[in-house]
Amino acid sequence: MASYEVLADESYSELLSILEWFSHFSLIPTLIGGWAVFVYNSYFGSVDVDLVGRSMSGNFLDTIERYERSHGYEEVRSAGLGIEVAHRKPIYRENKFFGYVEVDVCTFEADVGSFHEDSSKKLPYKLCDDPHLVRKVNFNGKSFAHVPKKPLLFLYKLKAFRDRKYDLKTRGAIMGVKRREWMRTKVEKDGADLIALLNPEPEQYVVREKFDFQLLKQLVENHDLSFALGSVKELPDRKKVLERHVGIKQKTVEQWVNTFFEKLAR
């Protein structure tokens, strides 16, 4: 198996284990990022596990930190959510080192949710505290998570896409080579995740959910996010993003993007 496949496989196992751990304390975290996209379109998976939730007077972070201390994780500075807690676990198979699975955790209270290009524009994780904007997902009968409904998750991924592109544009010249390449790879994955959420007929999924354009329109209006939607038009022209969707043609993605804006305008 390729390194990414090994890491994604291990990451998914860790995700299920972490969610089961939370269930022992009667807690259900909210899953965002690549594994949240996997719920709606299981095309790729993720290396990172991204979780958010209420602080609950420190219980949320304490729960995940206890898990990580007892499961071979080491604390690192997060390059993902950029918040309180990030830990990574080295992955070996047959004595070969493949890389790390990273777990990034953020509380609703700590997250500001500002766009990097304009701090006055915000899309906070606290929106996931609204039961009308998330759904409870059962992964295997023992592992549960809340996942943002497809329109909200789409906006979170769109924000990540724009934030990382902005960081590359404004700070890429002073980044180290590895950091810059990591950021470019993340931008590609964000773009691929956006396409995955636009796909009206995914081949595989955990939960089938129709894209609610009325909810998307409401979120965009409530948070003044129309400026960000232009990035969706870029997706069909990003070759490396399209390469992550084997068998899907550029014209198909163009049709999905056109349909997206047509339905949003109704």
Model-identified regions with their sequence ranges:
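Compositionally biased terminal segments of proteins
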Residues: M1-R266
